[in-house]
């Protein structure tokens, strides 16, 4: 059973109840303090490598043998389940395999309904005559990319991409963006960049979408102009400048792209069905489909994010009927928490509404109907959280594990990628590794209709992968280099950063000191960081605390720790080391019980604990405003640059002590492997010198 990650459901409720360690995890000074705490203290405390395919003939023999031995699959009746009420423990094994909020069982979600061949004509599926005027020219991206690519050119590009031979170009764009584009190196002189897209008029959309697209997206603005050309040209895209303000426009644009792709794929298959039936030509060869029906996959962090995507889709695809729409809304949507009015905008967007991170749903498009909760093998589009999808792919019963429904996905859209990092990135990696593998069973496939690049196990070189993230990390960069193989090109767009240090929400200047430590490799970073902290920074901190006459006034040190593993290491050191015997401290993380968090925050504010250890994931899920902070030590810089301003802003929560706190300031550790984080914090112009500077390893900004 896949590990849920973080012990969190949605934004982090229901943390794991763990047995306490064999040592003291916190230490309290016995000093006089007021019983009646400021209400503000507790106001928010309740809150596998790519598998190589078999040769074509062996694949046909294997799948045909399985099909013949089993005989025709029978129809199976869906099993209905009552909706479940109440909160369930995230680690409860039953939750992983049970039905949540009216979803089908795992077996039912994967069960096929015969006939289920991708090309089978279902009543009302598509009206071929209605779209007879939608025939596209050969240079239209859908045609040149999927339907009728130049086989010789495609083969050359696949060979170059498989050998990791890419030619690239980079440029600064209007709006403060940097672009890096790569294409397979087949002897071209240069790597062209596409012009910004001012409107959707140049996009070849299906006629049934055109009027809604024209009405609802009259023009494109901001960074959407720069990203859209590559998305509609079916290139791989890593966009690292996602913002809350442009998220709706980006979501609508992607919804048009995904829906348009589904409709074009289905209409082409069904028109060819009619052609085969009419001509009765045994030599007619029509390669127009994949092994299985699903063509688009969305990976999203929460159910409410799924609702927003579906709302965007139905703005443009407006069928006469939407089957099970009410059931979908009841199970996936919820109202925002009114107590979050003072939370940051990005927090409200991510966690507003239904923040459950365990879901999956299939959508099927027909001419007059959009069907919700369709079984995966009869779905055109799948929306899921990484946890929800992995649960069905990686079941405890090996015989029930299945990922064939991902074998023919042609467009993958991952939104809120940075939020998925805070859940469990291993789930995302697992899913990406299982995309476009050749299926283990036939699933009713007509192999005479399957496109040759599917049969040759080259689908990953044609598939489009789109990632939207507020910032880029090494893990996200790894997806760009490991899973983005699109032979028509791949692009990375990143902002040019001014630096979070210049945008602090404080009335007075704050001393911000950055200390670089040497490290030979990324794997040795944790040990080098720990050694530098305990020998240099902690010794000074302990001396200041233990030699002060007033322990309460000497306290107020917040230690911010991005990694949970580093947090455990530091917490254990504070609890057991002779160096910190006389230092009172508290430690709170994403796994800490709410009551313990409240106690630690109150002890820290009143001076009973001089030091508070605080993790990045806890801040991500709760966005606490910690009072009593007089100085900040960043054991590592946050991935999210917004967090820098919020954490440093703790220094100004007590107006009477803001000047003293500003003098205490911030001290942050970094190594050369923190380059991406450092760029977001200090700015693109400063980061190079700080990483290469030979004259010193300490840098101070006011």
UniProtKB/Swiss-Prot annotation:
Protein name, entry field: U3 small nucleolar RNA-associated protein 25
| Region annotation (Disordered) ranges | 1-157
Q: Name one GO cellular component term.
A: nucleolus
* Pfam families found in the cross-reference section: Utp25_C, UTP25_NTPase-like
Subunit info here reads:
Component of the ribosomal small subunit (SSU) processome composed of at least 40 protein subunits and snoRNA U3.
Q: What family is reported?
A: Belongs to the UTP25 family.
Q: Which UniProt keywords apply?
A: Nucleus, Ribonucleoprotein, Ribosome biogenesis, rRNA processing
Ranges of compositional bias, category Acidic residues: 31-49, 88-107, 114-138
């Amino acid at each position: 059973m896949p590990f849920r990650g973080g012990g969190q459901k949605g934004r982090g409720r229901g943390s794991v109840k763990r047995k306490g360690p064999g040592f003291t995890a916190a230490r309290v000074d016995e000093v006089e303090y007021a019983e009646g705490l400021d209400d503000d203290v507790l106001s928010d405390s309740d809150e596998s490598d790519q598998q190589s395919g078999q040769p074509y003939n062996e694949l046909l023999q294997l799948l045909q043998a399985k099909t013949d031995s089993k005989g025709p699959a029978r129809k199976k009746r869906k099993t209905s389940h009552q909706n479940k009420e109440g909160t369930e423990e995230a680690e409860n094994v039953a939750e992983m395999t049970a039905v949540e909020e009216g979803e089908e069982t795992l077996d039912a979600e994967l069960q096929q309904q015969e006939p289920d061949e991708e090309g089978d004509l279902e009543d009302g599926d598509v009206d071929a005559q209605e779209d007879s005027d939608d025939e596209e020219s050969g240079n239209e991206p859908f045609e040149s990319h999927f339907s009728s690519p130049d086989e010789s050119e495609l083969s050359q590009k696949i060979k170059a991409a498989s050998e990791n031979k890419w030619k690239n170009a980079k440029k600064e764009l209007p709006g403060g963006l940097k672009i890096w584009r790569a294409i397979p190196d087949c002897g071209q002189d240069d790597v062209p960049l596409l012009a910004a897209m001012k409107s959707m008029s140049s996009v070849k959309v299906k006629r049934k979408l055109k009027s809604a697209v024209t009405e609802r997206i009259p023009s494109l603005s901001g960074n959407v102009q720069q990203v859209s050309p590559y998305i509609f040209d079916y290139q791989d895209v890593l966009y690292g400048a996602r913002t809350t303000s442009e998220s709706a426009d980006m979501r609508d644009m992607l919804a048009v792209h995904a829906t348009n792709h589904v409709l074009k794929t289905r209409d082409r298959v069904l028109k060819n069905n009619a052609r085969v039936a009419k001509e009765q030509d045994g030599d007619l060869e029509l390669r127009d489909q994949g092994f299985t029906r699903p063509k688009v996959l969305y990976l999203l962090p929460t159910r409410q994010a799924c609702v927003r995507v579906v709302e965007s889709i139905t703005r443009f695809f407006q069928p006469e009927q939407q089957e099970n729409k009410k059931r979908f809304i009841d199970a996936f949507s919820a109202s925002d928490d009114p107590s979050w009015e003072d939370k940051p905008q990005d927090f409200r967007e991510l966690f507003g509404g239904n923040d459950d991170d365990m879901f999956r749903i299939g959508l099927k498009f027909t001419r007059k109907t959009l069907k919700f909760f369709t079984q995966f093998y009869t779905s055109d589009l799948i929306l899921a959280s990484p946890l929800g999808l992995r649960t069905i792919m990686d079941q405890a019963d090996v015989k029930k594990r299945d990922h064939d429904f991902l074998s023919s996905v042609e467009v993958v859209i991952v939104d809120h990628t940075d939020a998925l990092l805070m859940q469990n990135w291993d789930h995302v990696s697992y899913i990406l590794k299982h995309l476009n593998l050749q299926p283990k069973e036939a699933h009713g496939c007509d192999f005479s209709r399957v496109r040759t690049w599917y049969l040759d196990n080259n689908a990953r070189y044609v598939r489009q992968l789109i990632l939207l993230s507020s910032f880029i990390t090494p893990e996200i960069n790894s997806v760009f280099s490991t899973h983005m193989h699109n032979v028509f090109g791949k692009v990375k767009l990143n902002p040019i950063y001014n630096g979070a240090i210049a945008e602090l929400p404080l009335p007075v200047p704050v001393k911000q000191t950055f200390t670089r430590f040497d490290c030979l490799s990324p794997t040795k970073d944790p040990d080098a960081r720990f050694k530098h902290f305990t020998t240099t920074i902690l010794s000074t901190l302990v001396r200041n605390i233990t030699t002060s006459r007033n322990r309460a006034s000497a306290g107020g040190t917040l230690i911010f720790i991005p990694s949970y593993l580093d947090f455990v290491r530091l917490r254990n050191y504070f609890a057991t080391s002779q160096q910190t015997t006389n230092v009172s401290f508290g430690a709170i993380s994403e796994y800490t019980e709410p009551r313990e968090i409240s106690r630690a925050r109150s002890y820290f504010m009143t001076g009973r604990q001089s030091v508070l250890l605080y993790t990045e994931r806890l801040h991500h899920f709760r966005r606490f405003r910690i009072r009593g902070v007089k100085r900040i030590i960043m054991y590592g810089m946050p991935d999210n640059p917004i967090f820098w301003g919020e954490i440093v802003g703790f220094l100004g929560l007590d107006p009477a002590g803001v000047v003293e706190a500003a003098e205490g300031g911030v001290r942050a550790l970094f190594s050369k492997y923190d380059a991406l984080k450092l760029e977001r914090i200090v700015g693109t112009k400063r980061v190079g010198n700080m990483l290469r500077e030979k004259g010193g390893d300490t840098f101070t900004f006011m």
